[in-house]
Regions:
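Helix-loop-helix hairpins and the membrane-proximal interhelical loops
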Residues: 1-49, 130-142, 194-290, 402-404
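Transmembrane alpha-helix interface/packing and boundary motifs in multi-pass membrane proteins
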Residues: 17-32, 63-76, 158-164, 257-268, ...
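Membrane-helix interface "capping/anchor" motifs
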Residues: 23-34, 49-50, 158-173, 316-320, ...
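Central hydrophobic cores of alpha-helical transmembrane segments
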Residues: 35-39, 169-181, 325-330, 396-400, ...
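Alpha-helical transmembrane segments and their membrane-interface exit regions
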Residues: 42-45, 63-64, 156-160, 179-182, ...
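Helix-loop-helix junctions within the multi-pass membrane cores of secondary transporters/permeases
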Residues: 58-147, 271-397
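Loop-to-transmembrane alpha-helix initiation sites
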Residues: 146-149, 186-202, 414-417, 436-441
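Juxtamembrane boundary at the C-terminal end of a transmembrane helix
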Residues: 449-459
Length: 459
């Protein structure tokens, strides 16, 4: 039951989350999983109500995904990883002198998609709730008891592996990584999850850190002074989003944001963003017109995939079946001792679906009321301040420190070394073109994958 204090806490957490992720979103090259998952997990382990943490998380998605496109539009530099596909279209617009128009359209698309996809996803999840019990029913396959949702996860990890840059290595990694995880659990003597999850999360960062310890490799790292970044000038941007986009752009946002929010249940948000954007760009003969349409629609898709990829697995399936739910939203599927189970189970058992929907919509509105006006009025000033005063490396140092503390909490000193082992291997695989989503989803399905391998091998 939601009371007045719950609303107050949701307001405070959503506001803080929005302000924090406005800054993180603008920082160049920030990774969504590395910056969102550790904080959500820390809040859950600290005993914060899981529904309030989910409110924090939804507000973070909105603030992060709106702001990570700002440095793209103004400087041609991506904020988060999801903003990377936007760079070519942004550069096309900058060359033609339309950087301010691009920023205006992107902000408007993000606002519309945030509200649309959240309401749409909650409605679809409610309709699919009866399917949840069926998906959690277990069947006997080769003598192994397997929940039906596992096959959704398995299909998702195969699809993700096939869309990775290094397809063959990604496919081979699935059984190998599952065996490593189960082997480490055997050493620990318990079902450790959190430290492994954190290891994958910080993998690319830790790989870079350890690589820099090698004298020969360190010499190959380019050293430069301060980088000069020129921000495009922007004119007035209307607060009314419908004044900033045309009918065709609005139609594509209304069509593709909901569709991709469903597809993100098992598919990669980055892959969907690239695919749909490229198709729309190629549909236009005029290069600038195609870039504008692709950029605007992608801003909507970014929000759609992150919201849908989180809520449908959480509310309906009860398992992380896609890169989003297994990655940034992964903490909601981990066993948390303080609440006696998994956060998503706590949310569904302690609150009605109406209460959950209302608090999430409220948190989204709080985030939009803070983020959208700030970005519309002060995007250039905020970007300049963040670029000058805040170091991305210092934030990554903070997230690594959080990960080390949580790994110790999870499994003591062995948990830290296990996390570092998983981190180095994950980082190396990511460097070779394997999507981290493959590793996150393999982590979830590792017990079943290994059990099936043993059954097939007659062990």
């Amino acid at each position: 039951m939601i009371d007045l204090m719950m609303i107050v806490y949701a307001t405070i957490l959503s506001a803080i989350s929005s302000l924090v992720y406005i800054v993180i979103g603008i920082l160049p090259g920030t990774d969504e999983t590395a910056t969102m998952a550790p904080i959500a997990l820390a809040l859950l382990l600290a005993g914060v109500d899981p529904l309030l943490v989910l409110s924090w998380f939804i507000a973070a998605i909105i603030a992060f995904k709106i702001t990570d496109a700002i440095p793209v539009a103004l400087a041609g530099i991506p904020g988060g990883v999801m903003a990377v596909p936007q760079v070519p279209d942004a550069l096309t617009a900058r060359e033609k002198g339309y950087a301010d128009t691009l920023l205006r359209k992107g902000n408007s698309a993000a606002l519309i998609a945030s509200i649309l996809t959240l309401v749409f996803t909650l409605a679809v999840a409610w309709l699919l709730l009866p399917v949840g019990d069926w998906l959690n029913t277990k069947d006997q396959v080769l003598g192994v008891s397997i929940p039906r949702w596992f096959w959704i996860l398995f299909a998702g990890v195969i699809i993700l592996a096939l869309t990775s840059k290094n397809k063959l290595l990604a496919l081979i990694t699935i059984p190998l990584f599952a065996l490593m995880i189960q082997g480490l659990r055997g050493v620990y003597g318990k079902n450790v999850v959190v430290s492994f999850f954190l290891g994958i999360t910080i993998g690319p960062i830790m790989y870079e850190v350890f690589q820099s310890l090698n004298k020969d490799l360190r010499r190959s790292i380019a050293r430069r002074g301060f980088k000069e970044v020129k921000l495009a000038k922007i004119d007035r941007i209307y607060l009314n989003p419908f004044k900033n986009i045309n009918r065709e752009e609005l139609a594509n946002i209304l069509i593709w944001s909901p569709i991709t929010s469903i597809l993100a249940t098992v598919m990669s948000p980055v892959g969907l963003t690239i695919l749909i954007g490229d198709l729309l760009r190629e549909s236009k003969k005029d290069k600038l017109e195609g870039a504008m349409l692709a950029y605007t629609t992608r801003e909507g898709i970014k929000l759609g995939t992150y919201i849908g990829g989180t809520l449908i697995p959480l509310l309906v399936i009860g398992a992380p079946t896609g890169p989003m739910s297994a990655g940034p939203a992964g903490p909601f599927f981990q066993d948390i001792q303080g609440i006696g189970g998994k956060p998503f189970q706590y949310i569904l058992s302690h609150y009605s679906y109406l209460d959950i929907s209302l608090i999430l919509i409220y948190s989204a509105l709080v985030s939009l009321l803070i983020t959208y006006p700030l970005i519309v009025k002060y995007s250039r000033e905020i970007t300049r301040y963040v670029f000058r005063r805040i170091s991305a490396e210092s934030l990554y140092g903070l997230f690594i420190a959080i990960a080390l503390v949580l790994a110790y909490y999870d499994a003591g000193l062995p948990g830290i070394f296990g996390m570092l082992l998983v981190a180095v291997i994950s980082g190396a695989l990511a460097r070779q073109g394997v999507s981290l989503g493959v590793l996150f989803m393999t982590l979830v399905g590792a017990p079943t994958i290994v059990a099936l391998l043993k059954a097939v091998g007659g062990v």
